Amino acid sequence: MAPKAEKKPAAKKPAEEEPAAEKAEKAPAGKKPKAEKRLPAGKAEKGSGEGRKAGRKKAKKSVETYKIYIFKVLKQVHPDIGISSKAMSIMNSFINDIFEKLAGESAKLARYNKKPTITSREIQTSVRLVLPGELAKHAVSEGTKAVTKFTSA
C-alpha cells in the first residue's frame, strides 16, 4: 500500500495581518470606512514643526491675581507677620468675589437708571448696598480719598 499524503489543516492568517483594502471590501455597503483622527485647526502634533519655530517654548498664559498687593498691605499693617500660600489663595478668592459682587450691583444700578456707563457714583452706591454698616462707611471714605488722589495727580 502506498503511503497516504498527510493532510494539513489550512493555515488561517491572523486578522491583524490582513491588508486594509481587504477589510474595506468586507465592510457593509451602507457604512463608510472610519476617517482618520485629525487635530483641531491651528494645533499641530508635537513631532511636527508647524506653527512655531524649533526650540521655542510655548508662553504661559498669565493669570492675574492680587497676591502682591495683598502682601504689600499685610506688610504695611503687620511688617513682622507672613502669610501661607493657602491663606493667600483664600484672600485672592475673597477679593475676586467682592469685586464680582460690586461690579454686578453697579451694572444693575446703571441699567435701572438707563445709563450706559458705570461711574464712581454707581460704585459708591453698590459698596453701600453690598458691604454691611461700618465697613461700607470706611470703604466709601477710602475710595473717595483714592479717587481724589488719582484725579489730582
UniProtKB/Swiss-Prot annotation:
UniProt function note: Core component of nucleosome. Nucleosomes wrap and compact DNA into chromatin, limiting DNA accessibility to the cellular machineries which require DNA as a template. Histones thereby play a central role in transcription regulation, DNA repair, DNA replication and chromosomal stability. DNA accessibility is regulated via a complex set of post-translational modifications of histones, also called histone code, and nucleosome remodeling.
Gene Ontology, cellular component aspect: nucleosome; nucleus
Lineage: Eukaryota, Viridiplantae, Streptophyta, Embryophyta, Tracheophyta
Name under which the protein is recorded: Histone H2B.3
PANTHER family reported for this sequence: HISTONE H2B
UniProt keyword Nucleus present: yes
Short name of any one Pfam family annotated for the protein: Histone
Taxonomic superkingdom: Eukaryota
Modification after translation (UniProt): Can be acetylated to form H2BK6ac and H2BK33ac.
KW DNA-binding (keyword) present: yes
Biased segments, Basic and acidic residues type: 1-28, 36-53
N6-acetyllysine found at: K7, K37
Annotated region (Disordered), positions in chain: 1-61
Subunit structure: The nucleosome is a histone octamer containing two molecules each of H2A, H2B, H3 and H4 assembled in one H3-H4 heterotetramer and two H2A-H2B heterodimers. The octamer wraps approximately 147 bp of DNA.
Species name: Oryza sativa subsp. japonica
Cross-link (Glycyl lysine isopeptide (Lys-Gly) (interchain with G-Cter in ubiquitin)), chain numbering: K149
Keywords assigned: Acetylation, Chromosome, DNA-binding, Isopeptide bond, Nucleosome core, Nucleus, Ubl conjugation
Localisation per UniProt entry: Nucleus; Chromosome
Alphabetized SUPFAM superfamilies for the sequence: Histone-fold (SSF47113)
Gene3D superfamilies registered for this protein in UniProt: Histone, subunit A (1.10.20.10)
Family the entry assigns: Belongs to the histone H2B family.
Alphabetized GO MF terms: DNA binding; protein heterodimerization activity; structural constituent of chromatin
